[in-house]
Structures are given as structure tokens and as C-alpha cells.
Amino acid sequence: MDPRVAWIQPEQKGPANALWMQIWETSQGVGRGGSGFASYFCLNSPALDTAAAAGAAGRGSGGLGPALPAASPPPPGPTAPAALPPALLTALGPAAEGARRLHKSPSLSSSSSSSSSNAESGTESPGCSSSSSSSASLGRPGGGRGGAFFNFADGAPSAPGTANGHPGPRGPAPAGSPSQHQFHPGRRKRENKASTYGLNYLLSGSRAAALSGGGGPGAQAPRPGTPWKSRAYSPGIQGLHEEIIDFYNFMSPCPEEAAMRREVVKRIETVVKDLWPTADVQIFGSFSTGLYLPTSDIDLVVFGKWERPPLQLLEQALRKHNVAEPCSIKVLDKATVPIIKLTDQETEVKVDISFNMETGVRAAEFIKNYMKKYSLLPYLILVLKQFLLQRDLNEVFTGGISSYSLILMAISFLQLHPRIDARRADENLGMLLVEFFELYGRNFNYLKTGIRIKEGGAYIAKEEIMKAMTSGYRPSMLCIEDPLLPGNDVGRSSYGAMQVKQVFDYAYIVLSHAVSPLARSYPNRDAESTLGRIIKVTQEVIDYRRWIKEKWGSKAHPSPGMDSRIKIKERIATCNGEQTQNREPESPYGQRLTLSLSSPQLLSSGSSASSVSSLSGSDVDSDTPPCTTPSVYQFSLQAPAPLMAGLPTALPMPSGKPQPTTSRTLIMTTNNQTRFTIPPPTLGVAPVPCRQAGVEGTASLKAVHHMSSPAIPSASPNPLSSPHLYHKQHNGMKLSMKGSHGHTQGGGYSSVGSGGVRPPVGNRGHHQYNRTGWRRKKHTHTRDSLPVSLSR
């Protein structure tokens, strides 16, 4: 793995790390520029952990500049460059001297102009950055970039009030300010505050000792980059689960960050309203769904009556009102979706503005609905977004994938997981994260397989997707069918999908080793973070959030007028969702029957058979013994009045499920059999949506009952056979079970076809998850189930 993207793991640290990285540099032909400065040198520093930050707040940093008190954020505005500690200067050698000379040069931006075209066109890969663009980043005195290690100046101390030389966002730069002469578009990648690109050169050998102040009495606390880690975690996969929850709570947006973003939106909305009073500005993307990181951008769409999007007109108005930095406004009129990209002048928040794109607003509502369905989805998304963001793989523009593609991949992963019901909130997040990396880093066939989200989700051949595509494009490497726009490939522009696959594979290797039993023998197992092996937070992000909380602390409560449209939409969506959930199947019978299934085999086969055909080229071993964990699911069915009359009224009522006084309860179980006899009145009963059971009595009750597939509908009309399609009845008549694909017989009806509520998934534990693939093998044998009978 490229050491500029991957990191040296804690148990691998040693004196040979720096030598090995120099050998790798030579073998890859990654040389130093003419100045002697390494193009892969990291421009951010890892964040202090919680305990270290509190202990180091009140003392000097031992050569890295005065430390920032925990409650005092760095002030905005241009700041003076910081000095390097002597220990780190010695460790870096000629690289530091070359950077020092570059900082003195007055023609910095002009000397690096040759690299701007590639950076702006997006053709530059995340792993290849020119030395001139890296060097141009060094002298920037504000914006959270540069840091204590990279703003080199002869004897210039850190500016008062800065956190180790990492200033917060700056305000408008005055005339003649150095920042106006040192800005260059070639620094696009280096303006990512969360980037850990090249961090290994700060964590290896003597550089790591220099980073902590040389180990002397005035040494600064170590910087592991895991500020969310404030306690000891359980060993193995359970500890990773606990750490993901802590990371989510630490990185989730705070009210001050939301207030800051609303203020940015308000400024842009004011400019739009001045131009077009009838225009409507709406928010979509991560700010609308709440799945945004501290440095995420804001997506806006302007609705109005134009024949062509007025990109240039809005660009001129934004420049006139000084809303954005002049050099940051870019008009991408040749893109698939023409947009205006800008960076807010005051907050440095990046904003994307599009025109009349309804799909963005619909996509935000689509994601919100799935967040309600899968409560674990936000945790996975926030971890995955941080994982790609710090490697500059979070945008198609920089050679990665879009956030929308990532979210659809996560939804598909949860939909088609063969072993768990992702709608449950008690699943292990650590296991889900490792399996996500395994699927998309190792097992998924990017060449032949596409991803479908609608209709329960499926993996389909790209040839099938190509038949439905209306734009004339061929399926891309990462082919994701748009669930909202038929014929659109969401991953069409993700030309760097294979780089994302590579880092997913790297993360799977690292995490699977970290949670293995062997990891318990590591000498530093208690001090190191498992999630911190693949994710780190930079000090620049921490300082940026401090500055936000200080400045917008009094504005944290949203104004009613700002979010009125969003709140109304959410209220409407919530009401629609409640109506959908509360909708019951229509039936000519008026009484309800609460059915409790305590046998996991009653629901498992229908669930698994319906999703077999959607797993293309995959392997799931289903020959292993079934899971014995009991699962009881309750759902409502319509029962005929004559049948209810034959049931005793003294049967127990399930706890927590209030029913009308006319309701009766039927409990079916395969563990403890109860018998009762139904009197012999003649019954003319239509089929009801429940499983057929043998009933002993003088009269023959023969009704066909259909059971719908509760989890994932089949993508193929020919599902594989299931061992549970026939139940051997030991007590009563021997009757075959009908299929579960909505067919009817004799005037019967299917619960799904009639708008019925799908029952929850039964226990899918008998399909064990095989790490080597995702295929399901055909069942060639049958299993006898325990008898199911009803009697007094």
C-alpha cells in the first residue's frame, strides 16, 4: 500500500521505518523537487487525544509554539508563520532547508503556475502531487493550512493565540496581505484540513520523536490523532463497535456548526433574491440529511424560470457582494450538472450551487427515509466519509467517489446482507464496518456487476443496466443504478473507483488483523486505538471546530424563518411515512389476529430464497448449522370471524401489544404444542396471509395460505429451491406449502399483492456468512421441521 495513504501501524514502528520509506520512494521514482522538498510531505498534524490535550493546554510546547488553552479558540485573520523545532529541522534535513528557501522567495505563486492546469482539471490523481503545488501551500499564513511544521521562517515565533501554529479561518485579507500573493489554485488538494496525506513522514523514526518535542522535559504530548478515544474499550470486534459510537458522537455536527452553515446559506440566498426575487433556494446534500463532517461542503439548488442556467450572472453578483474569496469562485459550465463552486469568505465553507435540479432534493429525502429504516446507517456513513475525506477520495473531482455513491453502496450492503437484519439497532457496528470493507475491497466484481437499490436491492449484470440506460453511455466501473432517475448511472463519473477499492482492501486487512485474537498479544493493545489505525483527525479540524463554537455559540439556535421550508418538508415526509406504516391490508373481515412466531424456520426460507438470484457471482455458505438464538416477531393479520369464534377467549395476550376487546390472540410455536378442537360448523373461508397448519377435528379445514417474502424481493423469476418449502406435519394432515411470490389460487389473495404489511425478517442465522464470497449454494437436501398444530 502506498505509504502516503496508508500508515505504519503501532506494532510496526521502529528505527527502520524511515529507511524503508526512502527505499519505497526510490523504487517508485517519487523524487524530491529541485528545492529538495519532498512532494509527499504532510501539511497537517495529528490531533492530540483528549487527555493529552487537557494536560498540554497550560504549558509551552517545547519548541512548537505556545499551546492553546482548551476553551480559547484561535482568532481568525492572517497570522505569522511558525518556526520549526530544532529537533524536527534536524530530522527533516534538506527538505526543511529547501522549504525555508521557498518561503523567502517573493515569486512563489508564479513559480508554481505550471501545475495549476492539471490540478484544476481534476486529472491529477490523489497519489501524484507536484512539488511546486506542495511548496506553494507552505507560505499560506491562514486558513488552517501550513501548521507549525510547514510555515518555515527564520526565527519567526508562532503568533500569539494560535494552537501550535494552526490558525482558524481568516477574515477578508487586507490589501497587500501576503495571502493575496500566495494563493494558487494548485493548492486545491492541500486545502483539505482533514487530509492525512503523507502522515507517515511525521510518525516514523526520529520524526515522531521530533513531533513530540524530542522527548525532553518540555516535550509536547504525543499526537495519536484519535481525540474521540477517551476510555478503554473491550477487546476485539466489540471494542471496535464501542469506538465507532464514540467517533460518531465526537464528529457529529454541533449546533454551532449548523448555525454557521445557515448563516452562509442566508448570505447566498440574499444575493440570489436580489437578482431574482421569485427564485427559490433550497438545501440538499449532507447539510440537509445531517451526515456532514466539519469540513463538508454545502449543496444549494436555485429554482427559477430560465432557459439556460445563469451561471455567469450569479458569479458576478457573488463577486460584487464579496461573499466568496475571489480566486475560489469557479464556474463549471461544461460539467454534467453545471454548478458554481465557491468558498465562503468568512467561514471557509465550500459551497456548490446548481440550478433547477430537483433530483438533488429528492435524493436528500430518499436518504432520510433510509436513515429511518436503518438506524445504523448514519454511523457507517460518517466513518466511511471521514475515511475517504482524509485520503482526498471523497470527490469525483479529486479521483474518488461522491458521497451519494458511497451512501448508495452502504444502503445496498445493508439491504443484501445475508446474515443480519440491518433494521435492528443492536447489530455490531464493528463487524458491519469490517464486512463493508471486505465486500467492496475484495469480493465485489466491479467489472461485471452493478448495484440496484430499488425494489429491495439486488446485484445485477451490467448488461441489464445497459439496456435501460437512455443517455447512450456504457456502464461505468462503479455502476450504481439511480433509484430516482431510471437510466442514470450514479457512478458514471467515478473514474477513480479502483483507487477507492484499493483503500477499502487496505482497511479490511488492517481492521481484520486488529480485531483478531492475535492482536491481544500486542504490547500496546491498551494504549492504541483500533479505529485509529485507519482514521485520524487532524489538529487543524479540532482548531476549526473550536473557532466555530466560540464565534457562533450565541447563534446556535436556528431561526424559524431560515428552516421553514426544510421543517415543513420533513413534517410532510414524516406524516407520509406514518401513514404508510399504519396502513393495514383491506379485508372483508373486521377482526384482527395477532400472530407470534417463535420458530426461526417459519420465516427464514422465504426470506433467503427471494434474494438468492440477486447475488451474482457470490458465495454464501448455507450448509452450516442454523443459529439457535430465539427470535419472536409479531405482526397483525386479518382473520375470518367464524375461525375466531372457535378460539378460546382465555388464551394469553402478548405483552406490550394492546388489542381491541374483540380481538383474539393465536400463538403458534414449535416448542410447546397445545391442542384444541374446533367445532364442526361449515366454514367458507377465503385464504388468509399466514402459514398453513394441520388442524385436527371432525371437520376438514383446507385453506391455502400464502406467506410473502419479508426482506428482499427476488430479482429473478426463478429462485433457487429452499429446504423449507415443504413441512412434514406429524400431527394432522400432510399439506404442501405454497410459494411465496404473490401467486394466488382459488380466489385467494396474497398479503403483498393486497397492500398488506410485510412481516419482519425471521432469524437468518442458518445462512452463515462466508468471508470468501457472497454466493448462495443450492440446497439439495430437505430438512424436517417440527410439527405445528392447533388444538385445545
Swiss-Prot record:
Residues 744-756 have a biased composition (Gly residues). It comes from Homo sapiens (Human). It comes from the Eukaryota. This is Terminal nucleotidyltransferase 4A. Residues 764-781 have a biased composition (Basic residues). The gene is TENT4A. Its EC number is 2.7.7.19, 2.7.7.-. Keywords: ATP-binding, Cytoplasm, Magnesium, Manganese, Metal-binding, mRNA processing, Nucleotide-binding, Nucleotidyltransferase, Nucleus, Transferase. GO terms for molecular function: ATP binding; guanylyltransferase activity; metal ion binding; poly(A) RNA polymerase activity; SMC family protein binding. ATP binds at residues 360, 385, 403-404, 488, 492. It catalyses: RNA(n) + ATP = RNA(n)-3'-adenine ribonucleotide + diphosphate. Component of a nuclear TRAMP-like complex, an ATP-dependent exosome regulatory complex consisting of a helicase (MTREX), an oligadenylate polymerase (TENT4B or TENT4A), and a substrate specific RNA-binding factor (ZCCHC7 or ZCCHC8). Several TRAMP-like complexes exist with specific compositions and are associated with nuclear, or nucleolar RNA exosomes. Belongs to the DNA polymerase type-B-like family. Terminal nucleotidyltransferase that catalyzes preferentially the transfer of ATP and GTP on RNA 3' poly(A) tail creating a heterogeneous 3' poly(A) tail leading to mRNAs stabilization by protecting mRNAs from active deadenylation. Also functions as a catalytic subunit of a TRAMP-like complex which has a poly(A) RNA polymerase activity and is involved in a post-transcriptional quality control mechanism. Polyadenylation with short oligo(A) tails is required for the degradative activity of the exosome on several of its nuclear RNA substrates.
